[in-house]
Regions:
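Acidic, surface-exposed loops and disordered segments
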Residues: 1-417
């Protein structure tokens, strides 16, 4: 089959068939389960995923789907409005997709501008998935990422099958720092019309230090913040994590459903010490200080960097970067029929007092805890998704009909004739 025919085949797979057929199929070609009731050694050699298979998985998990609508009464003035195949609280998202296979370690370039409302509208445009994969894939190093095969960083029940030859392991890494800065501003500044009541912003207090003001004394005194509306800092940081953690989870689930459509095996897993994996990926770990127990993974230089020092000289600069109002290119496409002038009428922007208060809180966190965020890491690797070719002999031996579907049965003949 041609690439176009394979794309059409993947596109035609029914969504609800994928939802109800989805299973964790952990045993791949060339794998060995050394113990237990399903002890088995594959008689086949591993077969790596093809370029088009990886492209479809990447496109399903973290593809750029077109212009985000932002159909809100108070639209945000984002320069880019690129929608993704996963839901996110800002265009482009807070998550970078890394992946490793037998050939190397890669990252998907997220600096992509949407060209129209729906990037893929016709069958002829489905080749964009493959074109985007080729254009956005950036090689970071040669060879498979070496993840130590012991507890931790791996879970004990995944030692035998995770990151094996022939597999592709997808590692979505999310950034909490920018989310936290944005969320702090939304809690303190009524001008943003999010979580700060019109009568005064929330009084963010440090509940890990006796509920003292988190650097906000000036704004409490002048009434910009409502002293009676106390909000613990730990809850704000937790909420910032909630905002972001849904992204990698959805990326993995999208890929999981795509494996069903393509007839591949795989599963989403976690339960590891991500700090060690991030370090092996080349992430910068800022040494613990100010009472912190562990170092803070803040980014991969020049690839994916948190909104905090050392990538920003100060927390003031980090806040400014998050709220920088870079004008949208005059020729950039928009999803709406109205003029840009009409659209800007409802746009919201942080107020000068809100910006100053946000900076004060962020500086308090960094100065008090020696890191930003204070109670969690800047970068997180919560889940990974592995895809591989299943060994149907294994499933035929141990399981009844239905252990895998028609797409799995026909996969090698269809995709690797």
């Amino acid at each position: 089959m041609t690439a176009s025919e394979l794309l059409d085949l993947a596109w035609s797979y029914p969504l609800f068939e994928a939802l109800y057929g989805r299973r964790s199929r952990r045993f791949g070609l060339g794998f060995e389960m050394p113990e237990g009731p399903f002890r088995y050694k594959s008689a086949h050699t591993p077969v790596p995923l093809s370029e088009i298979e990886e492209a479809l998985l990447v496109g399903a998990g973290a593809g750029f789907s077109g212009l985000a609508l932002w159909d809100l009464p108070t639209p945000a003035p984002y320069r880019r409005r690129s929608g993704r195949t996963f839901p996110t609280t800002r265009p482009g998202g807070h998550t970078a997709l890394f992946f490793t296979n037998d050939e190397g370690l890669y990252v998907l370039d997220a600096n992509v501008a949407a060209s129209k409302l729906r990037e893929i509208e016709t069958p002829d445009e489905r080749t964009k998935v493959l074109e985007a994969y080729r254009a956005q894939r950036r090689e970071l190093r040669r060879g498979r990422l070496d993840i130590p095969r012991h507890i931790l960083p791996m879970s004990g029940h995944d030692l035998w099958d995770s990151n094996r030859p022939g597999s592709t392991l997808f590692l979505p890494v999310c950034d909490v720092s920018a989310s936290l800065i944005s969320l702090i501003a939304q809690f303190v500044d009524p001008a943003l019309r999010r979580y700060a009541p019109a009568g005064g912003g929330m009084n963010i207090v440090d509940d890990r230090h006796g509920c003292r003001p988190a650097g906000t004394e000036r704004w409490l005194k002048d009434g910009f913040l409502d002293a009676e509306r106390m909000l613990p800092l730990s809850i704000v940081e937790r909420q910032a994590c909630y905002y972001v953690f849904s992204e990698p989870a959805t990326i993995c689930q999208n890929m999981f459903l795509a494996t069903e459509a393509l007839g591949l095996g795989g599963w989403k897993h976690c339960g590891f010490l991500s700090l060690e994996i991030l370090e092996r990926m080349g992430f910068r770990i800022v040494a613990a200080n100010g009472g912190a127990t562990f170092g803070n993974p803040v980014g991969l230089d020049g690839v994916f960097e948190a909104s905090c020092p050392p990538y920003c000289p100060t927390m003031d600069a980090a806040v400014d970067a998050v709220f920088s109002q870079t004008p949208r290119e005059a020729t950039a496409p928009v999803p709406y029929r109205m003029s840009d002038g009409e659209h800007r009428v409802g746009a919201i922007r942080i107020s000068p007092e809100g910006l100053a208060c946000t900076k004060a809180i962020c500086n308090y966190i960094h100065d008090t805890y020696g890191r930003f965020p204070g109670g969690t890491d800047a970068m997180h690797l919560m889940w990974v998704m592995q895809a591989h070719h299943i060994d149907t002999d294994y499933y035929d031996r141990f399981f009844g009909p239905g252990a895998y579907g028609p797409a799995h049965a026909a996969h090698m003949a269809t995709w690797h004739p």
